[in-house]
Amino acid sequence: MIIKADLHMHTCLSPCGDDDMTPYNAVNLAKLLGYDMIAVTDHNSCLNCPAAVRLVVVPGMELCTAEEIHNVCLFPSLDAAKEFSDFVYDKMPDIINRPEIFGEQIITDEKDNIIGYEKRLLTVASDITEGETVKAVSSYGGVCFPAHIDRSSYSLLS
């Protein structure tokens, strides 16, 4: 059996995401393109995962480690992802987002209604090391892998 999947997808919650990149739009585009599965992996957060459950959606996040390596972290359930997200939030610097510079970090429901804005800047490195990431993700029943292997920044080899 062949499954067409995208396991590294951002929504409007991520600072790099456009405001039109809502979970609803991501799911519908994935359906139009014939995907069977997607993983919503916003930067250091899983707050938009609940809004994207109409396709097989793997809850996850793209975690920026203390070494500034980006890892895709995937979890078996939304509850596990939320618990890991709480763990990550405790390990992030308390820097307030500046929407005029980084854009809004939008949280939506499954119908794309805006239900909030993340105030803490999500594009910063956490205090979690690469080694701690693997152990922590595993403790929540998840798996992780490098989001970028050989890029000029935020990758395993840079």
Q: Predicted segment positions?
A:
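Extended substrate/RNA-proximal surfaces in nucleic-acid metabolism proteins
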Residues: 2, 54-158
